[in-house]
Structure formats: C-alpha cells, structure tokens
Swiss-Prot record:
Keyword Ligase (UniProt): no
Family note: Belongs to the universal ribosomal protein uS11 family.
GO biological process: translation
Domain of life: Archaea
Secretion signal, residue range per the UniProt entry: none
Keyword Glycoprotein: no
GO molecular function, one term: rRNA binding
Organism of derivation: Methanocaldococcus jannaschii (strain ATCC 43067 / DSM 2661 / JAL-1 / JCM 10045 / NBRC 100440) (Methanococcus jannaschii)
Chain segments annotated as coiled-coil in the UniProt record: none
Name this protein carries in UniProt: Small ribosomal subunit protein uS11
Pfam families assigned to the protein according to its UniProt record, in alphabetical order: Ribosomal_S11
GO cellular component entries: cytosolic small ribosomal subunit
PANTHER family per record: 40S RIBOSOMAL PROTEIN S14/30S RIBOSOMAL PROTEIN S11
Intrachain S-S bonds: none
Amino acid sequence: MAEQKKEKWGIVHIYSSYNNTIIHATDITGAETIARVSGGRVTRNQRDEGSPYAAMQAAFKLAEVLKERGIENIHIKVRAPGGSGQKNPGPGAQAAIRALARAGLRIGRIEDVTPVPHDGTTPKKRFKK
C-alpha cells in the first residue's frame, strides 16, 4: 500500500497599498510567522515599493522560503488599507498572486479581508453639509 503524505498548508497575507506591498506567510492557524517580505526589501527606490515588479520579486522570495519549509499549498488573504482609506488593493496584489502561482505553489482559496467601516470616522476630504 502506498503511504499518503500529509500536505502542509500555509496562509499568505498580502497587504497592498499604492505605497508598498507586504507579503506575510504564516502557518495554517495564523499564529506562527514563517516569512515576511515587502516591496521595500527588493527595490532600492522608495517610489517603486508599491509597484507590481517589486511585489512579484517579493513573492518569488517568499515562495522560495515556503518551499524550503515544505509548504506546497497556500490560502491567500488579500488586504487593502481599508477603514477610512482606500478600499481597493494596490497594483502589487495581483502581481504577487500571479507570481506565487508561477513559483509552483498550489493555491487553495483567495479571500479579501479588507476592513470595512460600519459607520466609523468621517473620511478625510469629504464634503460636509
């Protein structure tokens, strides 16, 4: 009888704004950090931290670390600044997801976890009556 290997799963949290992209890998419970890479670690210019290219390079670095740890399957949680800020993820989110898939990691589910205000503070630069 062939033995079945237990698949190791991880969670990849992608925080993407227009200024930076932070990719953070944890175990399946979310309690233990495996690796954390940001756009600022892979580029020299501050203006390029939020670019799709920097996000792609960061994702490839993270995928390398995950494979060393034996994690082949991941769930992805995408987050934008949210709250009273931008509700849409920055340009690096899609590039990072594509790079993780290209690196050979199997993606289970992709989830949007952007915080949504339930009538919280007034957004800045909003018209007041």
